[in-house]
């Protein structure tokens, strides 16, 4: 008598791995607070918290290319067609996008940082612009690197994306623990690089790996136009969402004391831990629905 094994739907596997990943990431973020306050002090950690608010803003640096590509991959899979040319085209466009935003950040970092971090001018003095620019670079690597995860989700192996994402945050936390227990003196910029740069670098390494595999694939003008046309709508939606959901950091940077900013940050981390249950299911179901 054959025993028929229960097949777990792929979206539940992805959702389950996403829950585990988000728990690890939220745990890292919450645990890092006490270490960062010990390393930097309350006022500098408040600055660190404001800079991490740029992470969501920098998620728009791919111009919606990742989400547009994810939909095309799902559509091609449903029709049993190759989507390699779409991936290569998207990676070319994302490279142009990141160059554009790096130039944009370099030009406007001085003006924006002077306003955004105006409450901490005495602490930062003339380091405001470079600190803001460095933060944008680190978080932009995460924004562009997210394209790698969009590809994996579209290929219905989102558990790999969740694994890589959780691993990258754990590496950042290990770096922070090394600094803390070694008693190494670091500033805000280096603390931010140690904790968040691995998050961007791991996903970017996967993008390089996929590009090398697709080096021989030929692309046409129609592939680029298709990606841009699909991505523009997602980019606009992302911008509107950011404006609505991230205005709070602009307000607290001007109105709250360092102690209040720290308290607000902790509260938002806890809220994010609860909110991930919904987002994990949505993230897992999206590519499946797109193939229907």
What positions do the PLM features span?
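Short membrane-interface helical motifs at transmembrane helix boundaries
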Residues: 100-123
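Signature of the first transmembrane helix
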Residues: 9-71, 98, 102-106, 138, ...
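Helix-loop junctions and terminal segments of transmembrane helices
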Residues: 63-78, 154, 271-292
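Membrane-interface junctions at transmembrane-helix termini in multi-pass inner-membrane proteins
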Residues: 11-12, 139-164
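Alpha-helical transmembrane segments of multi-pass membrane proteins
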Residues: 119-145, 192-197, 201
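Interhelical loop/hinge segments that connect adjacent transmembrane helices in multipass membrane
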Residues: 1-11, 126, 185-193, 204-245
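Interfacial transmembrane-helix starts/ends
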Residues: 12, 49, 81-96, 128, ...
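Hydrophobic alpha-helical transmembrane segments
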Residues: 162-212, 268
